Amino acid sequence: MRYCMDFESTLVPLEQELTYVDHYLCFQKARFPGRFVYSIHAAPELREVHIPKMLIQPVVENAFKHGHMQNRPNGFILVVAEYDKDSLVLSVADNGCGADEDALQALRCRMEQKDSGTGVSDHIGLLNLSTRIRLHYGQGALLTFGNRSRGGFEVSIRLPRSEA
């Protein structure tokens, strides 16, 4: 709780953000023992890269809220941070129930129109995240999401390498 309430530091090392995500997932494992496993991967050279605080945890939280990971046997969540050409890519994938394609398309349209979804409570986390990265990094930042071909859902956050 102290981590997210510290308003003095808006940028944190990736290592710190991943530690917070790890603590969140440990807490969820205690709540739902034996229901899922998780893995967090980041190359050592990325661990000191600074990113906006609370960038990854809300996406992981969505795996429980929308993917129903706590209700599925053999659930899996994968968090990866890696460089891809000129971008830092942060991705969260799960093997949950995925999402309805019509709802995904509607959300993509709202993001393209920069519609904050006033009065709408669905997917506010992804809309907020998209707005935050665009405000901080400009048009070079990108949030993508969709169902995985093998089932589940994946969210990728692409940040310009020179700024990350």
PLM region descriptions:
Residues 147-164:
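C-terminal end segment of the histidine kinase catalytic
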Residues 1-146, 153-154:
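Two-component histidine phosphotransfer core
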